[in-house]
Structures are given as C-alpha cells and as structure tokens.
Amino acid sequence: MEIPDFSSMKLDSRPELIDFEGVSMTRYFTDNWEKVKNFQARPDDILIATYPKAGTTWVSYILDLLYFGNESPERQTSQPIYMRVPFLEMCFQGLPLGTELADTLPTSPRPIKTHLPVQLVPKSFWEQNSKVVYVARNAKDNAVSYFHFDRMNMGQPEPGDWNTFLQKFMDGRNVFGPWYDHVNGYWKKKQTYSNILYMFYEDMVEDTGREVARLCSFLGLSTSATERERITKGVQFDVMKQNKMTNYSTLPVMDFKISPFMRKGKVGDWRNHFTVAQNEQFDEVYKQKMKNTTVKFRTEI
C-alpha cells in the first residue's frame, strides 16, 4: 500500500471549542458522532485510550509491532501509524473517517485509538468486553506537550501564549475536556471493568521493556524475550521521531517548522516551562481537583 496522499487536505481556519455533552470538543471530533456513538466493537478489539499527548502513538506502535511486526512487516514501511491504528472519532475533510478506517481494518485484532473521556466511549466496547489500554501522563508534562502540539496543529484551537494555555488547561478548557476528569474517569472505570490496563507514561520512559512485558501479560501474548527486546529498541523515542510512518510528518495539518509532533518524549520537561508562580498555582488547583482520587503520578523519574 502506498503512503496516502493528503496534500489536498486543507483547513480554512483553526476550529473553535464547543461544549459537547459537557466536554470541550471541536467539530473535527463530533461531526461524525452518530457513527462514533453506534460503532460496533468486537470482543478482540483493543482500544488505546489516552488524554492527548500522553503516549498514544507510542503504545499504538508497540501494539502494532507485537501483533503484526512479524506476520506483516511491510506494514511498518508502507502505512503511517494513523492508518494502521484508526483514530475513532476523527472527522477531517480530506481524511478517511476514523469509524470507516476502523470498520475496514483487515487485521485481527483491530487496534483502535481514542481520546474520548470514558463516559463518551461507544458502549459496544464495554458490552463486547473489549480490552482497553489506557495511558496516563503527569499533568505538568502533559500540559507542556499539549501546548506545543496546539501550536503546530492547525486542526486545534489557537493556544495563545504558554500562560494563557496553562490557565485554560487548569480550567479544563481543552479539546477532550479536563485532564483531571479524563485520568480519573478511566481509573474509576478500572475498579468495575477488569479489562482495562492502566499504564503510566513515566513508567514507560523509565523501563520500556518492563512495560512491554506488562502489555504482553495483559493481552495474553507469549512473546519471546528476544522479540520483546527487539520491539523495545524499535520504539525508542529517537527512533520513532525519525520514522516517517510514526512521526506524523505525512499529515499537512501539522506545521513541523513550529514544533515536531514528537518533540522531546521526556519526563520533567515542565521545569523548563513553569515559572515558580505558575507551579504554585498549578499545585493548588491540582490538589483541589485530585483530592478524591487514589491515582498517583510522578513528575520526575
């Protein structure tokens, strides 16, 4: 399969935030809502769920290699990751609909990505008892990464300067809603739905091999240690950043002159962005928003 030509994909202007069922969204993720809501999941589907910029592409690529790295190696060089792991709610003019891509995936299982908060996930995933891999990233690094992503992605609302963006982040006025509700929603769901693996970005950076082994265990895969090691090497940040099939450089809505899609992939980069005052304010808001949850994050490793 050839790399798709999306050169005709044009966006007139950046989208506005809209309130959608109590969550901040843009039309690019709600215009196809009937089909998203009624999407028919299968029991062997694997839903990769994250708040934006928390490691979605990383886990998508790991899963793709675990399942199809050996049997379909040509996929790795001929198809961008966003064609192999459809973004379910995506609805951009000039791009295939996420639901259509998922419906026509030739693979089994079907790895499918979403940024939807837990309450908006199509109910068929829960009814079919599909496996869900959730990746969470500490709020400070997530905010920094999301800011740079919004700067370079014309499909996102205008972020303004760093301080403006940070205030919006603390208020939950970002696409896909508040970070706090997102990470807590899936954490709570995990208590009643056993087929969720809740992963942390920081753990993946600290020991990728260990987390790949955890994934294999959750998915019931008997991947050899040699194979896991090969995959772990192949998914290192700098390798993926140079890989056209994983770095999103084939999508024209992203302006790499402003910032690359894969920027640093580090833990603790927030220290290079937060002022002392911003950090104090953020910690105060965080304490309030996270006071009723048991989920714990690391802001450095």
UniProtKB/Swiss-Prot annotation:
The active site is at 115 (proton acceptor). Its EC number is 2.8.2.-. Active from 20 to 43 degrees Celsius. InterPro entries: P-loop_NTPase (IPR027417), Sulfotransferase_dom (IPR000863). GO terms for biological process: catecholamine metabolic process; estrogen metabolic process; sulfation; xenobiotic metabolic process. One of its GO terms (molecular function) is estrone sulfotransferase activity. Keywords: Catecholamine metabolism, Cytoplasm, Lipid metabolism, Steroid metabolism, Transferase. Expressed in liver. Its main location: cytoplasm. It is found in: Cytoplasm. GO terms for cellular component: cytoplasm. It is an enzyme of class 2 (transferase). Inhibited by Co(2+), Zn(2+), Cd(2+) and Pb(2+) ions. Inactivated by Hg(2+) and Cu(2+) ions. It holds the Pfam family Sulfotransfer_1. Sulfotransferase that utilizes 3'-phospho-5'-adenylyl sulfate (PAPS) as sulfonate donor to catalyze the sulfate conjugation of a variety of xenobiotic and endogenous compounds, including 2-naphthol, hydroxychlorobiphenyls, T3 (triiodo-L-thyronine), T4 (thyroxine), estrone and DOPA. Belongs to the sulfotransferase 1 family. This is Cytosolic sulfotransferase 2. The lineage of its organism: Eukaryota, Metazoa, Chordata, Craniata, Vertebrata.
